[in-house]
């Protein structure tokens, strides 16, 4: 199973992420816009940074970057999930997508469920919460 970690700009369970990353659980790590700061804070350089970078305020350097315009039909998290799938991920752990603004949390949960319906196993990890969406037809 190819597992990616996506890190967004919301509350971030850095201890859990660092433990999983240190154990080699992820084949790749993607920073989603402001999630780049969260990763920098724990000393992790992502394999890819993706987004319009309105939350971060600058385009990161020193890593592969996919920049999108602020006016778009998909959220940065949706673009990151799509990119993970395009690169071969069949499982994704999402950090920094729960907590914070309720509208963003609900939108992310709907987004994760949508990707699970299309074959991706998705787990969202918050500071105090966890949501797991399994691939349709699996377990």
Q: Which stretches of residues belong to each language-model region?
A:
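Short phosphate-binding loop-to-helix
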Residues: 65-87
């Amino acid at each position: 199973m190819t597992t990616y970690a996506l890190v967004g700009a919301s509350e971030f369970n850095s201890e859990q992420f660092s433990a999983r990353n240190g154990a080699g659980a992820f084949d790749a790590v993607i920073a989603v816009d402001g999630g780049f700061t969260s990763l920098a804070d724990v000393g992790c350089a992502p394999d890819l940074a993706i987004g319009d970078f309105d939350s971060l305020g600058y385009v990161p350097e020193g890593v592969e970057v996919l920049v999108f315009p602020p006016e778009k039909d998909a959220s940065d998290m949706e673009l990151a999930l799509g990119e993970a799938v395009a690169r071969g991920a069949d499982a994704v752990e999402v950090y920094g997508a729960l907590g914070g603004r309720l509208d963003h949390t609900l939108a992310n949960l709907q987004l994760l469920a949508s990707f699970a319906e299309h074959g991706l196993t998705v787990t969202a990890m918050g500071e105090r919460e966890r949501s797991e969406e399994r691939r349709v037809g699996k377990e």
